[in-house]
Structures are given as structure tokens and as C-alpha cells.
């Protein structure tokens, strides 16, 4: 395990932050793919926190941000629950849901970790703002909110932002960036390992560098893993597929190295969309990846 003994599973069946519906069914698909059986085989003590209550759909609108009020309510409640889990000295394992739930996850973590390292495994940087976002979908702004880039009502969720520091953040698997995101990454000091970097350096060297960055002067390390970081041939069940992603073995190897480091203190897996999947392939893959993070070995 990492720095705690018990894993607390928290399902967040929420998909309002994404451009298409279906990721709200992700947690159940992951459970249906055998998550509890896999964790039992690893002999890991698990506390199932059950699904977080998802807000009703409001009629209110925001001129640029879709489902703004629902996302505020959801992430406020999620932050409180994650904080409660950490206070019990348990390992929060959050299952999404779309990537907008990261806002609540790290808002809860920030109430306990004042210098949090973040590994953001994603095809995208999720650093857009309401002004730069082409779509208005908040799942593309979730990391930006933690850096104070975003509407006050989002960044001011208790602990939400700015509670992350650019120098403590590593992006891995990136292969689609909007112009404003490129500019911010270059100017802010965030370390970004694109697919080009992974191809050139290999995942072993990338992870060595990444772990060095996120553990330098930090008091905890959070993994935010978007399943669209993988190549769509491996993980078809996700809403924003970008060709040329992380391979099956590269992903497993990265998570195995994170386990070996014993430095990861929390994790979330997001953007599994069973309505776009092929026979629950992506959910099964997610179960396997979670197992690698928590100690599954070939031998």
C-alpha cells in the first residue's frame, strides 16, 4: 500500500462536466468488471463508501459554462467526503465520472496536504478557462481550477484553489493542447511529458523524472488518471478519444512504478464511458490498472 492501510472506494456517478453523457455510469461498470474481486485477491482492506449523492439537474444556466451549478454542488460534497476519508488515515480511491470531479477530490485533499504533488495522466491538460474553452465543458478546466484559473465559485470551493503549485504538477500522455494551454504550460513551469517525450525517453525514464518532481518538497502525491490517456484501441470506452496514446504495457508499468515508490497517497480514475465501450473492455482495463497501482505483479 502507499502510506495508509485501508482503501476507501468512493464512486462518483457524475457526467455533467463532459461533452457527452455516459461517464456517470463509469463507477458501476468498473464494479461490474470485477473490482472488488480483484482487490480481494490482493488482500487489500477495502471500505466501500458507496456512491456519492449526485445533485439534481437545475434549470439555471451559465453563459459559458455547462452545468456550472451542478458541478459546484457535486464538488463541494465530494471535497467534504474526501477530507473525511483522509482524516481516517485511509487511502481515497475515487471512481468517476467525468474529470470535473477532480476539483472536489483535490479540494478535499488540500485540507490535509498543503504542498500536494499531482500526476495528471491524460490526453489533455485540462487547463482551459471559461474564456479559452472551445466547448464550455468543465472537465476540460479541472486542473486549471486547482491553480486558481477559473470562475471564483469554482476556485473558492473549500480547498479548491489555488491549492496546487505548477512546480508540483506533472502531465503524462498529453497529445492534444489548446493554444491557451500551451502558453500557460510554457510560462508556468508545469512539467508536461507529451506522447513525443514518452516515445523518445521511454516510460521508465519519464516516470523517474515525474516521481522526482512530484515528491520534491511535497507532503502527499495524488494520481489523477483519465482513461483517455490510453490509446483508443486499448480503451475505446471514453468520450474524448485521441489516437496515438499510452499503450497497455506503458500504463501498467507506470502504475507499477508508482506502487513501488510507496509515495502515492490518493488516486482517482475517470472518464470511463460504458455507453461507448466494446463489451466493457475499458472498465475491465481500469480494474487491471487499479490493481497495478495497488500492488498487482506478474510474478
Language-model-detected regions and their locations in the chain:
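Solvent-exposed alpha-helices and their adjacent loops that cap or buttress functional pockets
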Residues: 2-3, 111-113, 135-137, 158-164, ...
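Catalytic cores of soluble, metal-dependent hydrolases
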Residues: 4-14, 20-93, 105, 111, ...
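Active-site metal-binding loops of divalent metal-dependent hydrolases
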Residues: 14, 98-99, 123, 174-175, ...
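Short active-site oxyanion
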Residues: 90-92, 166-170
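Short, structured patches in soluble enzyme cores that scaffold and shape functional sites
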Residues: 120-123, 147, 168, 173-176, ...
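A general structural motif
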Residues: 150-154, 172-178, 205-206, 247-252
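Aromatic-lined glycan-binding groove of carbohydrate-active enzymes
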Residues: 166-168, 175-180, 217-221
